Every structure is written in structure tokens, then in C-alpha cells.
Swiss-Prot record:
PANTHER family named among the record's database cross-references: GLYCOSYL HYDROLASE, LP05116P
A single MF term (Gene Ontology): glucan 1,4-beta-glucosidase activity
Annotated source species: Thermotoga neapolitana
Protein name: 1,4-beta-D-glucan glucohydrolase
Active-site residues annotated for this sequence: 164, 349
Length: 425
């Protein structure tokens, strides 16, 4: 029997736009995901987050489920436009009330709240001013952060500035698959830089306002393996690791510079005097959050813009088409310790989508998900044995939910949601 350290936190994770529904209720403003999902062609089947899991009305039942399954921590995000409908300025008290109820109920049940300040639902009114491409967003984000710290920081001690900033910048502003749906490499890399500036300003405000809490940031990660021993394939894998994984952001945060292969590729797309901001970006953080789902084999490809292409392997895949590579979570954890040696690390998301069906007995037999989680948790344990200061593990996700551009077609929940009845199974 593998034992995890005393005090290790087992948790579940969600995000506001993916579960809440009622996006405009009680004075909330529109988010970019509201406008993006309401634009035909952006999301599979024309799905939107208008109802989602109706968590806005069923939050109490959902927290009871968290308690029932024995999770000791709950990672959730705050909807920026619920708190500041215009993005800055006037605070919406009803938005604060909603999250206050959630926080107080979690604490009554001895469940530790982990709050993600930004999980992709930017106020639409700020997008009209350029959104993440506007340098002023660092100040807008600091103002929003301050409102949260001042209202919730007395009770919430674990904070995450940004969820997966790479996805915000690249999938939202270069690939155009996520809100705001842009395809501009200059905007994408200005966004990378402004996300780092916003993160740093938020950390600074946190140090002034929350005296005994911890703050970190969360990254998406894939485990990139080279297709051969050839130098150019190894370099391709190194580039993907630096660009797609934690180094793109942790290198500036810990060392005050972008990683070498990223700079080689993207120097011309970054703001002209980006170096001037690096001193401010280099702020101490208390923990690093890592999300991990899948591994990839890559090779050098002279015809691709980044000189890299993916090599498909004959491996089991999830419903997302993602290859299942459990040892990748071990190498990502070991890598972050060796490269940056953070004080604390959390796995802030790990999980899988499968084609879940309700059986005749009214249950969902998701043995494939159980196998996926078990295999990854074994690798997480292995990383702890090798000295990674891992303090907790969060499953993605508590509930089936709005899976961004995939709509409701992909189910990640350890609890099944029947969207016709909102029944939790």
C-alpha cells in the first residue's frame, strides 16, 4: 500500500464558466466566452455556458457531493465579470455574495478552498479595449485581484493568479480556437508578456493584503518525447517543452528571462522593450500548479512554422484523442523540481474524458477513468519519493461540464451530469 505524506491534499477542480450557468444573472457582465460561444461556428453543436451544470443554483448540492466523496480541497475559479461587470470600477455585491456562500460552506465542511483568480472568462468590456493585448490589463487585473483578496482573503489562504496562461495566449490569440478567437502571432506573444505582468502585479497586491496566505500560478503541460536520437528531434522536443509547458512562464518568474529556444523563435513577436518589465515579473511565488493530461512524440519538421510536428503513436487514447502516458506526469514533476526548484508543487488538474454512459442500473461504470487516475497517481507517488515537494493532487473535474470549444460533447467529470435533468450521477 503506497502511503502519501501526512497532510497531502486530495481535491477536485472546476472553473466558473464551465459549470455555473446563469452568466448574466444578478448584475453580472458579459464575458468573452459568453460572446464567443454565442457566435455560430465557434463551439461544437452551438453549445454555450448559459446553463452548463447550473451550479449557480445548485452549488449547495455540489459541495455536498465534494464532502461525500471525501475530497479535502476544492479548486474553483471566480468569474471576473460577476465581480466587476465592466472589468474595473463598480463592484457587484451579488457576485461577491455568491462566492462568499461557497467559501463559507466549504469551510464549514473542512474543505480547503483554492481560488483561481482567472480561468479564461475575461469581461467582454475589457476585450473591447484590447483585452490581454493591452498593456493596461496588468493594472485592471491587479484591481480585480485586490477586490478578491480584500473580500475573501480573510478566509481563503490558497490563491492561483492564472490558469494555463499558454492556452489563453496561444489557443485564444494564435490558433483562434478559444475566446477571443484571434489568429495573430504578435498579439499572442504580447499576451504572453502581459499575462506575466498581470500575474506579477497580482502577487504584489497579494503580499500587501493577505498576510498568511500562499499564491501561485497554474500551467498546462504535455510530456514531449523526441521521435529519435537525432539532434534536431531532441531540439524539437526541447522547444515544445519550453514553449508549451511551464518554462515559458517560470523562466521569466524565476530567472527574469524567456527560455532560449522560445526567444530564438519569438523574439520579434514580443514587445520591443520587453526586458524592461522582467525585474517586476521576477516575483517570488509560494507554489507552482501543474496540469497534466497527455504525452506527445515530436520530430523536427522543416515545413512547419515552429519546425516541429507531432508523431502519432499506437497508444491508448481518451475521448479527446489524447494519448495516455502516465509516466509523463512523473517527468513533468521531476523536471520542474530540477529546473526551478519551487517551494511547493500541486497537481492542479489531472483527469480524462471518456464516452461515459449511464447503465440500466442508473450508474456510470467508468473503469477506464479509474484506471487512468490510478496509473497517474502511482507516478505522482513516485515523484514524491524522488523528492518533489508535492503537496496535493486535484482531479479534473468534479462534474461533467462545458468543455470549451468541444461544448458538452466531452465528459471529464468523476460525477456524471445528465444535462436534460441536471441530475448528478
Amino acid at each position: 500500500m503506497k502511503k502519501f505524506p501526512e497532510g497531502f491534499l486530495w481535491g477536485v477542480a472546476t472553473a466558473s464558466y464551465q459549470i455555473e450557468g446563469s452568466p448574466l444573472a444578478d448584475g453580472a457582465g458579459m464575458s468573452i466566452w459568453h460572446t464567443f460561444s454565442h457566435t455560430p461556428g465557434n463551439v461544437k453543436n452551438g453549445d454555450t455556458g448559459d446553463v452548463a451544470c447550473d451550479h449557480y443554483n445548485r452549488w449547495k448540492e455540489d459541495i455536498e457531493i465534494i464532502e461525500k466523496i471525501g475530497a479535502k480541497a476544492y479548486r474553483f475559479s471566480i468569474s471576473w465579470p460577476r465581480i466587476l461587470p465592466e472589468g474595473t470600477g463598480k463592484v457587484n455585491q451579488k457576485g461577491l455574495d455568491f462566492y462568499n456562500r461557497i467559501i463559507d460552506t466549504l469551510l464549514e465542511k473542512n474543505i480547503t478552498p483554492f481560488i483561481t483568480i482567472y480561468h479564461w472568462d475575461l469581461p467582454f468590456s475589457l476585450q473591447l479595449k484590447g483585452g490581454w493585448a493591452n498593456r493596461d490589463i496588468a493594472d485592471w487585473f491587479a484591481e480585480y485581484s485586490r477586490v478578491l483578496f480584500e473580500n475573501f482573503g480573510d478566509r481563503v489562504k490558497h490563491w492561483i493568479t492564472l490558469n494555463e496562461p499558454w492556452v489563453v495566449a496561444i489557443v485564444g490569440h494564435l490558433y483562434g480556437v478559444h475566446a477571443p478567437g484571434m489568429k495573430d502571432i504578435y498579439v499572442a506573444f504580447h499576451t504572453v508578456h502581459n499575462l506575466l505582468r498581470a500575474h506579477a502585479k497580482s502577487v504584489k497586491v497579494f503580499r500587501e493584503t493577505v498576510k498568511d496566505g500562499k499564491i501561485g500560478i497554474v500551467f498546462n503541460n504535455g510530456y514531449f518525447e523526441p521521435a529519435s536520437e537525432r539532434e534536431e528531434d531532441i531540439r524539437a522536443a526541447r522547444f515544445m517543452h519550453q514553449f508549451n509547458n511551464y518554462p515559458l512562464f517560470l523562466n521569466p518568474i524565476y530567472r527574469g528571462e524567456y527560455p532560449d529556444l522560445v526567444l530564438e523563435f519569438a523574439r520579434e513577436y514580443l514587445p520591443r522593450n520587453y526586458e524592461d518589465d522582467m525585474e517586476e515579473i521576477k516575483q517570488e511565488i509560494d507554489f507552482v500548479g501543474l496540469n497534466y493530461y497527455s504525452g506527445h512524440m515530436v520530430k523536427y519538421d522543416p515545413n512547419s512554422p515552429a519546425r516541429v510536428s507531432f508523431v502519432e503513436r499506437n497508444l491508448p487514447k481518451t475521448a479527446m484523442g489524447w494519448e495516455i502516458v502516465p509516466e509523463g506526469i512523473y517527468w513533468i514533476l521531476k523536471g520542474v523540481k530540477e529546473e526551478y526548484n519551487p517551494q511547493e508543487v500541486y497537481i492542479t488538474e489531472n483527469g480524462a474524458a471518456f464516452d461515459d454512459v449511464v447503465s440500466e442500473g442508473g450508474k456510470v461504470h467508468d473503469q477506464n477513468r479509474i484506471d487512468y487516475l490510478r496509473a497517474h497517481i502511482e507516478q505522482v507517488w513516485r515523484a514524491i519519493q524522488d523528492g518533489v515537494p508535492l503537496k496535493g493532487y486535484f482531479v479534473w473535474s468534479l462534474l461533467d461540464n462545458f468543455e470549451w470549444a468541444e461544448g458538452y460533447s466531452k465528459r471529464f467529470g468523476i460525477v456524471y451530469v445528465d444535462y436534460n435533468t441536471q441530475k448528478r450521477i
